[in-house]
Amino acid sequence: EPVTVKKTKWHHMDIKKHFEIINNNVRAGKSAQKFEIRHGECKKQDCKWGAQRTERHLKKLHYSSKKFKEPVFYALSIYIPEDFGYDFVASKMSLFQAKMKGVDMPLWMISTQGSGFQVRLGHYKRCHGFLFKKGSWNDFIVKTNYRRESIKSEKYFELWWNGVQIN
């Protein structure tokens, strides 16, 4: 059984209906996780408010074994179909985030915004205006350093999107 299944937490949604391990349309490796929520499947709310969208509960959990002295790298590839629209209704959805136990807000988060994405670093910094490349894979690599002391030559958070550093 793929490791990805063991690290995924489920809510009340039917696993067979909304999630599967696929072997086709895979970016890297032999398999991928596919999450799919169709219109109207958000607790009869028609997915109109982000807080009521149930895919927020389909989270891939990752617990890094790295020490806080070393940078931590994360990678995510997401396929955006050609018909991915600009519908602003319920267009905010977290794709990728890091949280600290006991802290409500994510340390950093990459989320959808219309037909693109935004990057948030806590409450204080936000990067806007990146449109997804439709009909293809969008690759994200995050390098972050959670150590307590700051070093002038090192950034706390660095992001590459499709091989280009954007911060």
Feature annotation, model-predicted:
Residues 1-167:
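Low-complexity, Ser/Thr/Pro/Gly-rich disordered linker/stalk regions
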